Amino acid sequence: MGRFLTTTALALLATGGAATARPIRACDVSTKYLITFGDSYSQTGFDVTGTKPSASNPLGNPPLPGWTASGGLNWVGFLVSEFNTSTTLSYNFAYGGATTNATIVPPYQPTVLSFIDQVAQFSGSIARKPDYAPWNADNALFGVWIGVNDVGNVWWDPNYDSLLEQIMESYFGQLQILYDAGARNFVLLSVPPIQRTPAVLLNNSPENQKAEALAVDKYNEALAANLEAFTDKNGGITAKIVDTGVPFNTALDNPTDYGAPDATCYNSDGKSCLWFNDYHPGIEINRLVAQAVADAWKGSFF
């Protein structure tokens, strides 16, 4: 049986170098790997066929802070550049607009890579543990933060509960693929309170905001229940859920403490407001999310 822990972290929780005599391998005994999947809340614009991550360039391509939707570093960038205690290399397959399974919840464009597509990219690249990414069960942490678009796109659907069951089946089908490839450490990030985004507050009635909040809660409850079943089924797993509602609400309830005039303004500099735009968190919320993940794995990965 695997070990399943739920963590609410704050409260309880590119360049290619000159040719060398031999290939540079990220195989120092202390090197760790952060292998992530998700949507625009996690994307850094990484292309696994491009420049590979290294100690001096942990995102690989593009270099820090990457191509993010935060105005600067997002939670992935913070983890590998500020919260790491040793060299931690990011292989980030997240893709903006992603849903878990595009046949269940279509993304905003058909070209968007779903969680299924992202895992397929992993399977076709670093799953085989190549010389440039010799990860193993002990030194690799697999992170998944997806569901914002799944919930956001169908919370209103009268068949939401049925769709949620299908989403979870697909989600944990992908985790099974990762497990079968050798993944044993998993951190799953919950869907944050998207009903508090400026977009939802400005464009939805109070009743609809409450309905979307309920849909978020249902998603996160299903995530926890399915993770417990997944760890019961598969041996040797250490899995933790980070409740992203804690860092989000910490900032949104105290905006001036984080350099913002209020909880609803947004600015593409990622700093003047808590929001980068009307749906994506800025730098400070991303820092808090990263801190939450680091706290959950303190003493092992961070």
UniProtKB/Swiss-Prot annotation:
Q: Which GO terms describe its molecular function?
A: acetylesterase activity
Q: Which UniProt keywords apply?
A: Glycoprotein, Hydrolase, Secreted, Signal
Give the glycosylated residues.
Answer: N84, N101
Q: Transport among the record's keywords?
A: no
Signal peptide span: 1-21
> Which EC number(s) does the record attach to this protein?
3.1.1.6
Write out the function statement from the record. Acetyl esterase that acts as an exo-deacetylase. Liberates acetic acid from xylo-oligomers.
What is the recorded name of this protein? Acetylesterase
**The organism of origin for this protein:** Thermothelomyces thermophilus (strain ATCC 42464 / BCRC 31852 / DSM 1799)
